[in-house]
Amino acid sequence: MVFGRITELFTAASSRLPAGSQSSVPYMPTGSSPDVGTSVSDSISIGNGGRKNCLRHSASLQDFSSYHGFDPEESILPREAISWGQNGSSFSKEKGSVPNGTNPSTRRKLIRAVMIVMCLFLFAFLVYIVSMYIYTNWSRGASRYYVVFDCGSTGTRAYVYQASINYKKDSSLPIVMKSLTEGISRKSRGRAYDRMETEPGFDKLVNNRTGLKTAIKPLIQWAEKQIPKNAHRTTSLFVYATAGVRRLRPADSSWILGNVWSILAKSPFTCRREWVKIISGTEEAYFGWTALNYQTSMLGALPKKATFGALDLGGSSLQVTFENEERTHNETNLNLRIGSVNHHLSAYSLAGYGLNDAFDRSVVHLLKKLPNVNKSDLIEGKLEMKHPCLNSGYNGQYICSQCASSVQGGKKGKSGVSIKLVGAPNWGECSALAKNAVNSSEWSNAKHGVDCDLQPCALPDGYPRPHGQFYAVSGFFVVYRFFNLSAEASLDDVLEKGREFCDKAWQVARTSVSPQPFIEQYCFRAPYIVSLLREGLYITDKQIIIGSGSITWTLGVALLESGKALSSTLGLKSYETLSMKINPIALISILILSLLLLLCALSRVSNCLPRFFRKSYLPLFRHNSTSASSVLNIPSPFRFQRWSPMSTGVKTPLSPTVRGSPRRPFSFGSSIQLMESSLYSSSSCVMHSCSSDSLGDIQYDSTGSFWSSPRRSQMRLQSRRSQSREDLSSSLADSHMLKM
């Protein structure tokens, strides 16, 4: 039973050794000798000098492979038998170096350094993710504020928005926006919008710094009251100018933007120079579409829903934006990605199609039809002209901004040509004039006319035709509200209301509505918006939904800017990797598990675990063993005992020595016991214990193998630290000389 257990232990140990590094020394009982006639391969061969032995260096007689055969006739001991430096072995207590390849300790240090760096990097990344996740949860109530100025052709409007993180799972949009202008009550002037506004527009204030201050300061003061004082310095202020400033000369627009920036630099909000700029018509359309679909809960919806197109009618231009399944590649194409949802948009701006510019074009069209225009009257501003879209009894001065390019020699002031308009209402002529203002070929430099009955006459060549459901906002909403029409009213209802208004005398019409700007132009605006939708864009009544006054493109600016800021400072509720969302809890768990595995690998390489976590080491002999018998008092060399780190006061010998022998270091009755009792295993991880009766009985043959004779007297040799390599070599040579 004991030998069976021993066999199992040796089998398990040998199975873990590489095939090329297993010891070639078979076990041979003490005192036995090889049979007569046994071949060299059957004897106790210790291997050639060039082959690494399985015995660990610096323990007892480390490497028997360094012995060479001794020729008694020549009586010369080979030099390699005395000096083992060439094979990296030595009788000294220093370890030999590896003859070939990289030093294992160097390779282990390199692996250890790489693993330490990986552990530090993984730990730092884990700390970052955990801190961001904790900060995000602690910052649920944190909000950022945004102030956006809409610098249009008719005036400057201020909007304030509050942005916070969206934790709802039914949307991929991470931002929740709240407009702080919703609670503002409209003034008695009959404004259609709930907003803070100053007049006139920036385009009317060129070279008028005092006018700019007057237009800006009330907006800043109002915004300060909407935002908590402790959040003023973190509030971002954006000033975006649209078509009114776009049509100015570059020098004039640069002067306006520069002076606006110098005024806003003293405000309590954060405003950068690049945030004061002119945006293109396409950008304005893009912002408007984003704001519309956010408010209708279509933006970032999961699963994806059909979005609405946006028709944003301003004072100078019309912005058209819709989602187009046909991926065209031109200046109107835009791609928007919200979370995992992609939107392919067609967006363009139609300059000159705003409500104010359209009426201006109607005046230009009538001016061209006047015969024999007196230039002196234009210069002096005495020209009088009848307009079919003005109420009877109306008589007033009108500044025509486009008339100067049509009539040479006219008096052009800072804002255009002054013309006196007289009301001459005619509904048929008014409708035809509105349709003429829609047809781009009538007032542009197009060589060929466009028939509005055959194609959309407001679209330039190459622009995609609008399709789908549309929200008509801004100017469309203003006209509907002026006539007290609900959003469900049809375009025919607009025409009916417009005709009724045109039939009224000016004094009656003016008092029938709340005081507001441009009352006289609504007789023209009613047929104009209908003709613009039906003939200009080919959009039917069923495709139109009239939006509220709260839908403005400024919301899109705040939404997109807050998305950039919040994603970089607060962290979002999920992380997208390879188009797959990972919950922060799962990501943190994966990182912790990876760190633990890496630490286990590092401990395996560097043996850096505490001693009580390590597997117990089982050497063949105790440190204080002084006999060749078993530590269990059983006369067998195969019994093992668990190693104990407790010192018994007896040092473990590391070099062979003679105990209880005559003064000569070696005699015929002596024996050598080779023991390895180091704390660490040998290079092949196998513990060896080899003994022989006497060095004097060692027989060498021509092949370099040896065996011991059992006829010699038994005398034990025990290793000691004081025996040097030279003494042992001399003893070996002396013992062989005696045999001769």
From Swiss-Prot:
GO terms for cellular component: membrane. Keywords: ATP-binding, Calcium, Glycoprotein, Hydrolase, Membrane, Nucleotide-binding, Transmembrane, Transmembrane helix. It catalyses: a ribonucleoside 5'-triphosphate + 2 H2O = a ribonucleoside 5'-phosphate + 2 phosphate + 2 H(+). GO terms for biological process: anther dehiscence; pollen exine formation. It is a multi-pass membrane protein. InterPro entries: GDA1_CD39_NTPase. Belongs to the GDA1/CD39 NTPase family. PANTHER family: ADENOSINE/GUANOSINE DIPHOSPHATASE, APYRASE 7-RELATED. This is Probable apyrase 7. The gene is APY7.
